[in-house]
From Swiss-Prot:
This is Cold shock-like protein CspE. Gene3D superfamilies: 6.20.370.130, Nucleic acid-binding proteins (2.40.50.140). It comes from Bacillus anthracis. It is found in: Cytoplasm. The gene is cspE. The lineage of its organism: Bacteria, Bacillati, Bacillota, Bacilli, Bacillales. Homodimer. Can bind to ATTGG and CCAAT motifs (Y-box motifs) of single-stranded oligonucleotides.
Amino acid sequence: MTLTGKVKWFNSEKGFGFIEVEGGNDVFVHFSAITGDGFKSLDEGQEVSFEVEDGNRGPQAKNVVKL
């Protein structure tokens, strides 16, 4: 299932952050889950679509697409 949300914060030096989902819990996002070529980073407040999978520490985003 594909969800949409906004980037709550993303630390490009460490390569991870969180996506805010309206009416739901924040979802962890790692730079390796961002689709596209080049430097993979997200900006605070940026809208994205993504899928959720169970990671080692709970739900995490995969197939993240910048909208």
